[in-house]
Curated annotation (Swiss-Prot):
GO molecular-function term, one example from the UniProt record: structural constituent of ribosome
Stated family: Belongs to the bacterial ribosomal protein bS16 family.
Keyword Ribosomal protein appears in the UniProt entry: yes
Name of this chain's protein: Small ribosomal subunit protein bS16
Entry-linked Pfam families: Ribosomal_S16 (PF00886)
GO cellular component: cytoplasm; small ribosomal subunit
PANTHER family: 30S RIBOSOMAL PROTEIN S16, SMALL RIBOSOMAL SUBUNIT PROTEIN BS16M
Length: 82
């Protein structure tokens, strides 16, 4: 099953996350199919959340299942999530 979820990167005590499309069996920070954007939970910049909405909509149409957090972030960017 293909999932849209967060993959952590950044340094200790300074988390950043990639919003990625990956196989559900892969580890959290393992390889991914496509990078859809990034998220900074500390909101240190104006662009703390950036998502390629066209590609996100494409993957959702292909049947990718977003995690609860990814769903919330996609909705915040205006992506229609069922």
């Amino acid at each position: 099953m293909v999932k849209i979820r967060l993959s952590r990167f950044g340094s200790t005590h300074n988390p950043h996350y990639r919003i990625v499309v990956t196989d559900a069996r892969r580890p959290r920070d393992g390889g991914y199919i496509e990078n859809l954007g990034h998220y900074d939970p500390r909101k240190t910049t104006e662009t703390y959340l950036k998502v390629n909405t066209e590609r996100a909509a494409y993957w959702l149409a292909q049947g990718a299942q977003p995690t609860q957090t990814a769903r919330r972030l996609l909705k915040a960017q205006g992506v229609k999530v069922a």
